[in-house]
Amino acid sequence: MKIYRSTLLHTPASPFAVPDALQTFSDGALAVGDTGTIAHLGTFTEVLAEVRAACPDAEVHDLRGGVLLPGFIDTHVHYPQVRVLGGLGMALLEWLDRNTLPEEARLADAAYARTIAGEFLHGLASHGTTTALVFGSHFAGAMDEFFAEAAARGLRVVAGQVVSDRLLRPELHTTPERAYAEGKALIERWHGQGRSLYAVTPRFSLSASEGILDACAALLTEFPDVRFTSHINENNQEIEVVRGLFPGARDYLDTYERAGLVTPRSVFAHNVHPNERELGVLAAQRCSVAHCPCSNSALGSGLFPLRRHLAAGVHVALGTDVGGGTGFSLLKEGLQAYFMQQLLGEEGAALSPAHLLYLATLAGAQALGLDGQVGDFTPGKQFDAVWLRPRAGSTLATVLAHAESEERTLAALFALGTGDDVERVWVGGGVVFAREAEA
């Protein structure tokens, strides 16, 4: 048994539903068993007494001087795009054509894909992300490299081969038959192995014909516990193209709905420009939306209508959208989400630091159906955590030293925190990133 002593902050419930959902311990502790399961949570004095009564030799890890949060959960991030981060000055479709698709084509080479997988997974872990819903590669071999590397590093990943059959580069296209066959083989090799799960992943309706969408639906039917993810309503130009490709569809969501792809296992990225029917269906079907505020801002896609999603009952979590976004940091995404709602004025949703933490942690676990395992520090869940410790003399260290409350501490972490403040990261009780090991 190990005891971790630190300032502890987590949201075991949604602040959108429970106003006092933020739970804080200024001198708190977690006791973690040998299997990585949290056994006790409370003040350090309480936890030490409980654990030492049964386990006198339990070791104490003193993490004071920093803040311990649940591991971040990224619900939309692209594995092949780590090297195209920073492509500013373009809207979505031009950015895809000029920056992204040429790079994605390079992952046909397995050795190159292996290198990219390592860079990508290091980017996640080094920014405190312990679980991610990952848009994969168009190549099955590249997905084998990805899952193998994720297993070696110990991260939790939900990922799948991306499938398309039109309007991209020809080498990225597949057929419905091949999409089904390769997807099935990948599911049988990787789904449920260790910490890996599979997500059926058509790129978006713009590049996926009805045949591709039907093949995806066949996989969801055959494997009832795999997940589904795709893009929706990101950019007005994209929406118009999809409307022309599916003249019989009521709207963008209907292109997926008609194929049977709108279910509680579905996570749709962006949804910046939904209509009321789409919001109603997403809520009724208990789908989730991955809100990617940095990407939406960088690509000029629009301001996310969070208040409308919440009013309709649609579940929302955060995604970084590497490489359309601006990096792997969910602290940055939380801050940008806050800015975006501020800019919307009366049409925006009022967000507190507790909301930002929830969106970056438990909300993602709920979107992925993993909230029984991760997302907060409730005893019985896995110890997935990030220890943030600012450098001595930094502005963040100064602010934290004078913070009047734990909520003020949390606000400062989102406002000022960066990847450089991530000191150590655990998944299932094991260290997956340590800053000192990078020195």
From Swiss-Prot:
Hydrolase among keywords: yes
Coiled-coil portions: none
Q: Which domain of life is it from?
A: Bacteria
What SUPFAM superfamilies does its record include? Composite domain of metallo-dependent hydrolases, Metallo-dependent hydrolases
Please, one GO biological process term?
guanine catabolic process
Group of enzyme by EC: hydrolase
**Keyword Metal-binding part of the UniProt annotation:** yes
UniProtKB keywords: Hydrolase, Metal-binding, Zinc
Which Pfam families did the record assign? Amidohydro_1 (PF01979)
**Family (UniProt):** Belongs to the metallo-dependent hydrolases superfamily. ATZ/TRZ family.
What's this chain's function? Catalyzes the hydrolytic deamination of guanine, producing xanthine and ammonia.
| Name of the protein this chain belongs to | Probable guanine deaminase
Q: Which organism is it from?
A: Deinococcus radiodurans (strain ATCC 13939 / DSM 20539 / JCM 16871 / CCUG 27074 / LMG 4051 / NBRC 15346 / NCIMB 9279 / VKM B-1422 / R1)
The organism's taxonomy opens as: Bacteria, Thermotogati, Deinococcota, Deinococci, Deinococcales
